[in-house]
């Protein structure tokens, strides 16, 4: 079983958004997923209610996710996506300890980029693989990323933080889909938003495969990233 945790001590970075879109992208009968909403704000739970279906299934966690994760493993769940609150509380630390990989969303601005440091330190302390995902980014122009995205990448290098090479652009389709209780691919499969979510998922899958291979070989898992 693979556990993907979305964590950042800053609010509004896109933890719930990415968790919802990726879960909707991945879930199917042959690849069952579970959502865990550990954020008291309940954004992921709201999205799930708007879906009008119990697929993927969702559980709420207040102080700990460990029991839910253990039960999911017994039930044969393949992927677990955990949304966490914007802090470094006990439930966030517990989620990181249970993670196969931690995704740290950050918008390409000085406040968001600076805020990733505490989450990075927690991942390193727990020896858990992690990667920063630039979310809510300005659209590329002629396939060239915005200068502010480039600056964000350069800043993250100073933290020795692995950063996904792509970006999730600030697109209306992402918000419209959530309002309908859908993921980007369900809302408009041929859209650019769906394509970016698909590329992010492909990167996560590759990383998890590398993490699993490294763990089998006794390698340093906390150095793996998307």
Question: Which residues does each PLM region occupy?
Answer:
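Inter-lobe coupling/hinge region of RecA-like P-loop helicase motors
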Residues: 175-198
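Inter-motif core of Ras-like GTPase G domains
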Residues: 89-110
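Structural beta-sheet core signal
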Residues: 35, 82, 104, 132-134
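Beta-strand-loop-alpha "switch" segments that mediate conformational coupling across diverse proteins
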Residues: 152-182
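G-domain G4 guanine-recognition motif of GTPases
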Residues: 107, 131-146, 166-177
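P-loop/Walker-type NTP enzyme "switch/lid" segment
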Residues: 2-9, 13, 24-93, 144-150, ...
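Hydrophobic positions on the alpha1 helix immediately C-terminal to the Walker A/P-loop
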Residues: 18
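Conserved C-terminal guanine-recognition region of P-loop GTPase G domains, centered on the G4
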Residues: 113-132
């Amino acid at each position: 079983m693979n556990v993907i945790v979305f964590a950042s001590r800053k609010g509004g970075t896109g933890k719930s958004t990415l968790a919802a879109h990726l879960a909707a992208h991945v879930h199917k009968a042959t690849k069952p997923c579970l959502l865990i909403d550990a954020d008291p704000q309940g954004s992921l739970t709201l999205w799930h209610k708007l879906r009008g279906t119990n697929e993927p299934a969702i559980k709420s966690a207040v102080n700990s996710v460990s029991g839910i994760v253990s039960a999911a493993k017994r039930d044969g769940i393949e992927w677990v996506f955990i949304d966490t609150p914007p802090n470094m509380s006990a439930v966030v630390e517990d989620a990181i300890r249970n993670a196969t990989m931690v995704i740290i969303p950050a918008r390409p601005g000085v406040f968001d980029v600076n805020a990733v440091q505490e989450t990075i330190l927690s991942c390193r302390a727990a020896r858990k693989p992690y990667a920063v995902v630039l979310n809510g980014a300005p659209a590329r122009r002629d396939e060239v990323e915005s200068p502010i995205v480039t600056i964000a990448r350069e800043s993250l290098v100073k933290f020795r933080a692995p950063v996904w090479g792509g970006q999730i652009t600030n697109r209306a389709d992402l918000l419209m889909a959530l309002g309908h209780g859908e993921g980007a691919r369900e809302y408009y499969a041929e859209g650019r938003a769906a394509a970016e979510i698909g590329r992010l998922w492909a990167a996560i899958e590759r990383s998890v495969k590398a993490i699993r291979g490294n763990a089998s070989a006794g390698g340093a898992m906390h150095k793996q990233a998307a």
